[in-house]
Amino acid sequence: FDVPEPFKWVDHFFYEKLDEQHKGLFFAFFDWGKGPDYWGKDTISLSQEQVDAKFELDLEYGIFYGNGETIENPSENGDLQGIFFSWGSE
């Protein structure tokens, strides 16, 4: 399906001084914006790696669950995406 115009990713929206963690994420978005013919395994894998890295970083620094509780033992929490996708569902 087509992505509505206000939500299309455009190449000119890029920060030159972007840290390495986020550069891969930006490039994955650029590939996603090109359409399904460009959604190779590498793009999907990179996107997943970037999301997982973000969750790990947030947990490492004790980011909130979303309900005001901090994460007690970030290294022991294996359901990183479960935390993210549960925000606002309580």
Curated annotation (Swiss-Prot):
Location within or outside the cell: Secreted
Keyword Methyltransferase tagged: no
Record flagged with keyword Repressor: no
GO terms, biological process: suppression of blood coagulation in another organism
Main location as per UniProt: secreted
Record-level Gene Ontology MF annotations: peptidase inhibitor activity
UniProt keyword annotations, A-Z: Protease inhibitor, Secreted
A Gene Ontology cellular-component term: extracellular region
Domain of life: Eukaryota
Primary role: Potent anticoagulant inhibiting the amidolytic activity of factor Xa (F10) (Ki=4nM) and reducing its ability to activate prothrombin (F2) in the prothrombinase complex (EC(50)=40nM).
Name used for this protein in its record: Leech factor Xa inhibitor
Species of the source: Haementeria depressa
Lineage: Eukaryota, Metazoa, Spiralia, Lophotrochozoa, Annelida
